[in-house]
Amino acid sequence: EVACASLVTILLMPRSGGAMYTTIKTYSKLAKVSVRGLSEEDTVIVSTLDYTTEDHTLFAPLWAGVPDESHAVHMIGRALSDASRFYRPYGVPACPSLTQPEAETVSQSVHLLWNLFVCEGLLRYGFRTDAAKLFAHNMTAVIQSLKLNRAFHARYHAERGTGIGERNALSGLAPVGLFLKILGVEILSPTRVKLEGENPFPWDVTIQFKGLKVIRGQKKTEVVFANGKSVTVEGGESAVVEV
């Protein structure tokens, strides 16, 4: 019986290896749980879902642009950048507050898709450097996995960077599109490129596409088109370069 506002009787049918029952309704609290028909050798385990645990989905509002600027800064500074909460050397883990060893492959998993959402949220609020830092953490895990195991993995360990789950899963591939967004480069066509902000990475980046070459430096960007024409853009102002 589950005692709350009403009583629900749990009937366990004996079988080899035990039995399991999940209540149909949800309850705000339990006054009593009783199971009848057990022998002295039987063991009963009662478990509930913990909705108070923080997980990476809490950053979805950043991606959707829901909070105002001050609230977003608060979320980024006090949660995303806090080592006691979500900040880890290889990315944002799924449920960092769960520290039990048996839950590690789930709680400490870095899901690249959810980290992508976080990065896009950072970009939305102007935190390009923070997005670049998080992306670099993710890529360190991806590169390490390729070097050690010659494979991508579905997820990566937030503390160690080791691969978790299925080998060569699509969800573990390096997000090239996200890299270009953080870099501030959008190739509209072989003759048209949109530039935004400055290169947040500590190295120059060269991109080649159908005869087009974009050399993204720290303070300037050179765009070389297939016909040989070259255009240099200084600073971090948004611009569309075309021929």
Short names for language-model regions:
Residues 40, 66-69, 228, 238:
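Short, glycine-/Ser/Thr-/acidic-enriched flexible segments
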Residues 222-224:
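Feature 926 captures the class I aminoacyl-tRNA synthetase adenylation module centered on the KMSKS loop
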Residues 50-78, 104-220:
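C-terminal capping/lid segments that line or modulate ligand- or cofactor-binding pockets
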Residues 35, 88-97, 149-153:
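Active-site-adjacent bridging/hinge elements
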Residues 19-30, 46-93:
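Extended ligand-binding clefts on enzyme/binding-domain cores
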Residues 44-48, 89-108, 160-163:
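Active-site-adjacent structural elements in folded domains
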Residues 3-42:
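Beta-sandwich interaction modules
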Residues 29-32, 226-243:
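C-terminal beta-strand-rich structural cap/linker in extracellular carbohydrate-active enzymes
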